[in-house]
Swiss-Prot record:
Residues 162-171, 225-235 have a biased composition (Low complexity). InterPro entries: Plus-3_dom, Plus3-like_sf. Disruption phenotype: Early flowering, reduced plant size and defects in floral morphology in whorls 1-3, but fully fertile flowers. Reduced seed dormancy and increased germination rate of freshly harvested seeds. This is Protein RTF1 homolog. GO terms for biological process: flower development; negative regulation of flower development; positive regulation of DNA-templated transcription. SMART domains: Plus3. Component of the nuclear PAF1 complex (PAF1C), which consists of VIP2/ELF7/PAF1, VIP3/SKI8/WDR61, VIP4/LEO1, VIP5/RTF1, VIP6/ELF8/CTR9 and CDC73. Residues 261-396 form the Plus3 domain. It holds the Pfam family Plus-3. The modification N-acetylglycine is found at G2.
Length: 643
């Protein structure tokens, strides 16, 4: 803070930063004063006035001359860009004097602001408060500067020799340049604290201004050395040399920024490949080391091949343990937030999408152009060298006991192996005994809750055991059904229990039949015939072999007192099929004169050609064949060019 106050006090004789930020035209006018033209005009004005900037006391100078001297002094300050005169404050006074301490002009202004949105009203009041604070700060600096002024004796009002005037002009120019450097340094410190990116832009934009200041300083140096004495010459030389160093500071800083951009080889050395990410995934230094490194992210494919972007790693995101993915032969829930250009383009990517190859120089140039286009953060060579050293230190990393314990815990949580509930429960019981011996109530409750969770997980597995067995059985049956459907084999349904090939779970064709028996022991033939006739009507069967067999079976069942159908019922459709079971000889030799199997296609093509020749209209190409609508895997790969 001491350096900042000294810089503020040193700059008090010129202007303040608040005024410069509020008035861009005046700031441009003051920046223009850094050039050699303004400095020469300031030197000439000092010579013409004969060192009149040192005014005598008001009691010794007549009123008319004192007023003229004040007007000349005010005009000189405006030309030199001092900005402390009344002309610089006219714009502020016209606005700042309109509102009072409550930041409102009048009741009409209060009602007008009340009708606005809260955001607009707060923005206007904030701007007024800033202007009022800047005005108070300016008045304090002006009053302090005026209080530090000392009355000048009458001897200093005498005309000075030409050499004295030139020396005073050179010294005043040196003082102005020193103030300019102090203000530039103060502005650079403030901008560095608030916005480093804006500071870099300001340095790049100030290359032209620094060059003009360099030229003006070299122009002042021979002027002073040619007219001053030997003692004053050495003094002015040292001051002009310091001015040269100060004026060259902006250009040197800008050149340093250009030379501080990391080269392709630097970026290549800190680019981490996918295999290295998989190796460092469970290491304790991974989340800290990977920040600031570069990775190649695969964003898609083109005709020429995959497309990669060279991105800078911002941080590691491991906030969602449920979203896991595979990386090499490991399972992880860690994602990388990477930046390409500006930090507003940060995106989360899986480490499985990172390339395992080295970056290309074209990708490096694309990244440089994107950073410059979006005004993003450019890592310096110092950052790259520090990251290289950090990567080298991983080879000699020393694992502490706490680190090893943490790594084991992470590997255990990331493991996909099923947990041994009995062993885990036994371990928790031992920990419970230790916690009870130490009277650790919190530890006891925590361990008991874990034991309850293990019991609940075991009960849940027991409930799901039956469902799992049924699911396995269904899966087995589906596989068997698919196998039977794909294989052509005869299924013998006439096998009985105990015979070879008999399957009790195989499906058989059945047909429902309704039986009834009014008298258990009745043997009257008429009643049996009536029962048979009723059964025949129910089944829709006619007289025949099937009906006789069914009648015999029913009669035998009635005599035994049982209602068991020993043979599959035969309906009218079955008998009709049996009647048409005979061989019919057909000959296709008569079709040979029409072209045989290809006759249909030939006839279609002939009719198509005749129609097109006669009508002159094209016939749709439909050859009458049914083409396959499916492709095999090999055909698909061949068409896609994968084979």
């Amino acid at each position: 803070m001491g350096d900042l106050e000294n810089l503020l006090l040193e700059a008090a004789g010129r202007t303040n930063s608040a005024g410069r930020s509020r008035h861009p035209p005046s700031s441009r006018r003051r920046e223009g004063s850094y050039s050699d033209g303004s400095s020469d005009s300031r030197d000439d004005s000092d010579e013409d006035r004969g060192y009149a900037s040192r005014k005598p006391s008001g009691s010794q100078v007549p009123l008319k001359k004192r007023l003229e001297a004040e007007r000349e002094d005010r005009a000189a300050r405006v030309e030199g860009g001092y900005g402390d005169g009344p002309s610089d404050r006219e714009g502020d006074s016209s606005e700042e004097s309109d509102f009072g301490d409550d930041l409102y002009k009048n009741e009409e202004d209060r009602q007008k602001l009340a009708g606005m949105t809260e955001f607009q009203r707060e923005m206007i009041l904030s701007e007024r408060a800033d202007k009022k604070g800047d005005k108070n700060f300016t008045e304090k600096l002006r009053s302090k500067r005026e209080s530090e002024k000392t009355p000048v004796s009458k001897k200093e009002t005498q005309p000075l020799p030409a050499s004295r005037g030139v020396r005073s002009s050179a010294r005043s120019a040196d003082r102005a340049a020193a103030k300019d450097d102090a203000l530039n340094e103060l502005r650079a410190k403030r901008m560095k604290q608030q916005d480093p990116a804006a500071l870099r832009k300001l340095r790049d934009a100030s290359k032209g201004g620094s060059g003009s200041r360099d030229f003006s300083s070299t122009k002042r140096k021979p002027l002073a050395s040619s007219n001053l004495s030997s003692s004053s010459q050495s003094d002015s030389d040292s001051r002009s040399q310091s001015d040269d160093e100060g004026s060259n500071g902006g250009m040197l800083d800008s050149d340093d920024d250009r030379s501080d951009v990391p080269t392709f080889e630097d970026v290549k050395e800190v680019t981490i490949r996918r295999s290295k990410l998989a190796k460092w995934l469970m290491e304790p230094f991974f989340e800290e080391l990977i920040v600031g490194c570069f990775v190649r992210v695969g964003i898609g494919r083109s005709k020429s091949g995959p497309i990669y972007r060279l991105c800078w790693v911002k941080n590691v995101d491991a906030t969602d343990p449920d979203k896991t993915y595979k990386l090499e032969n490991k399972t992880t829930h860690k994602y990388l937030n990477v930046v390409w250009g500006n930090e507003t383009s940060a995106a989360r990517w899986q480490m499985a999408m990172i390339s395992d190859g080295h970056p290309l120089e074209e990708e490096y140039r694309q990244w440089i152009r994107e950073v410059e286009r979006t005004n993003g953060r450019m890592p310096t060579k110092q950052d790259i060298s520090e990251k290289k050293e950090a990567i080298q230190r991983t080879n000699s990393f020393v694992y502490s006991a706490e680190t090893v314990k943490q790594m084991l815990q992470e590997k255990k949580s990331a493991s996909v192996r099923p947990m041994n509930v009995a062993a885990e429960k036994d371990r928790l019981r031992k920990e419970l005994e230790i916690a009870q011996s130490k009277n650790d109530e919190a530890g006891v409750e925590r361990i008991k809750s874990k034991i309850k969770q293990l019991d609940a997980s075991r009960n849940k597995k027991g409930v799901d055991k039956k469902a799992l067995k049924l699911a396995e059985m269904n899966k087995k049956n589906r596989a068997e059904n698919f196998k039977n459907a794909s294989e052509v084999k005869s299924i013998t349904a006439s096998l009985k229990a105990g015979e070879a090939g008999y399957d009790p779970f195989s499906r058989r064709w059945t047909r429902s039949s309704n039986y009834y028996n009014g008298k258990n022991k009745g043997k009257d033939g008429e009643e049996n015939e009536a029962a048979v006739a009723a059964a025949v009507e129910t089944n829709g069967a006619d007289a025949g072999a099937g009906v006789e067999a069914t009648e015999a079976a029913l009669e035998a069942a009635a005599e035994a007192g049982k209602l068991i159908d020993t043979r599959a019922p035969i309906g009218q459709g079955a008998e009709h099929n049996q009647l048409h079971n005979f061989e019919l000889s057909l000959s296709l030799t008569a079709l040979q004169k029409y072209g045989g199997p290809q006759g249909v296609q030939k006839a279609f093509m002939a009719r198509k050609q005749l129609t097109e020749a006669t009508v002159g209209c094209r016939v749709a190409e439909n050859d009458g064949k049914r083409h396959g609508l499916t492709l095999t895997v090999s055909d698909y790969k061949r068409r896609r060019g994968l084979l």
